[in-house]
Design a protein with these regions (language model features):
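Acidic/His-rich structured neighborhood in mature extracellular/periplasmic domains
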Residues: 46-170, 190, 214, 223-226
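Low-complexity, Gly/Ser/Thr/Pro-rich intrinsically disordered linker/tail segments
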Residues: 171, 188-196, 206-207, 213, ...
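Short alpha-helix capping/helix-loop boundary micro-motifs
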Residues: 174-185, 199
Length: 258
């Protein structure tokens, strides 16, 4: 009971922040509410790769930055639209909602976003608010196969991933450069928006995911942190985090569609 009261207090605090957050949207508040229930849950990597055969894994007790966002989004969509959370999760995580081996999972966030937009789950609000773009040049997975359990001994999977990278590496995407992110946030960024943090690491587009959360007059990051080993709300502002992460270049901002 005490834990539930603490979560409610934190949610209400986040919703009553500085005016820079602007008017909040119901869908965003639902996302934030669901995300806050994960506070303190342990960060565990590779929870989707416990089996040799690809299958839908639902582990709400151990998350990484991506599965944390996926679970919260799936739970929120199930609440507002009806239906099973697992059905939404499969359509969020896999290309066209079909599980067909390791490479059917949406490993690159560029494709994850594209899939979510096509399914009507999310909208990319970055382009409406930022003219800055980055060209898509994806190659990291195929050039680092030993870093992935299902690639290091599978030339077939590496070839499939290369095909995915080639198809995705056209055009560009809009992002908000880190220099334009203030401690107080921006009026068009709302509580519960999904943050996809972009990177200068060759062959990658995004290196971290989380949620926007206004608190104490600052825009913060609610995320599954590998360094803290759990889901946390950043102590400093989101903008401050960029000063300590030299590989972070900016952010794509997504919003759930109710």
């Amino acid at each position: 009971m005490i834990m539930k009261q603490s979560i409610l207090i934190l949610l209400l605090t986040a919703a009553s922040l500085s005016l820079t957050a602007g008017a909040q949207e119901p869908g965003c508040q639902l996302i934030l509410h669901n995300a806050l229930t994960y506070l303190g849950k342990p960060y565990v990597a590779h929870t989707l790769e416990i089996n040799d055969e690809e299958q839908l894994v639902v582990n709400l007790e151990e998350v990484d930055c991506t599965t944390f966002v996926e679970y919260v989004l799936a739970q929120s969509l199930a609440t507002v639209r009806g239906g099973a959370m697992e059905d939404y999760l499969k359509r969020i995580r896999y290309r066209d909602g079909r599980i067909d081996g390791y490479t059917s999972r949406l490993h690159y966030i560029a494709e994850w976003v594209e899939n979510g937009v096509q399914n009507g789950f999310i909208k990319d609000i970055t382009a409406m608010n930022s003219t800055d773009t980055v060209p898509l040049k994806l190659s990291f997975m195929s050039t680092h196969p030993n870093a992935y359990r299902h690639l290091k001994d599978s030339p077939e999977n590496v070839k499939k991933i290369k095909d995915v990278e080639r198809k995705l590496s056209v055009g560009s995407f809009h992002y908000l450069p880190k220099e334009k992110i203030s401690d107080e946030g921006l009026p068009w960024i709302k509580d519960g928006d999904i943050f996809c943090i972009t990177t200068n690491i060759a062959g990658l587009d995004v290196v971290h995911l989380g949620f926007a959360c206004y608190r104490d007059g600052q825009l913060k990051l609610l995320h599954a942190s590998s360094s803290s080993k759990q889901v946390v709300l950043s102590e400093g502002s989101f903008a401050q985090m960029f000063r300590h992460n030299k590989n972070w270049t900016g952010v794509r901002v997504l919003r759930m569609i109710q």
